[in-house]
Design a protein with these regions (language model features):
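N-terminal, polar/charged subdomain of small-to-medium soluble alpha/beta proteins
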Residues: 1-87
């Protein structure tokens, strides 16, 4: 599975990139035909502390799974996104 990470207004640190790759590779145990997973990281322009948004797009033949979550940290948003995609 190919993993793509794109960002808007933020530069992810290496541990975050590694966490993203590790979490997304676990999705293959649920969907064995995943072609690509794209992750979009964005810091929303708001005064709210829950301003870290992750949009996860999992491409599988015939359908795409799209999950968008916002939280206080990218790690929190990532965990929620992957958990939702598993369902």
């Amino acid at each position: 599975m190919k993993i793509t990470i794109q960002t808007v207004g933020v530069t992810p640190h290496e541990p975050l990139k590694e966490r993203i790759e590790k979490k997304l590779s676990k999705l293959e145990t649920f969907y064995d035909k995943i072609v690509e997973a794209a992750v979009y990281l964005k810091v929303e322009n708001t005064s709210d502390k829950n301003n870290k948004t992750i949009e996860l797009v999992v491409k599988i033949p015939g359908n795409d799974i799209v999950v968008k979550k916002t939280g206080a940290s990218f790690e929190e948003s990532l965990d929620e996104s992957v958990d939702t995609a598993k369902k």
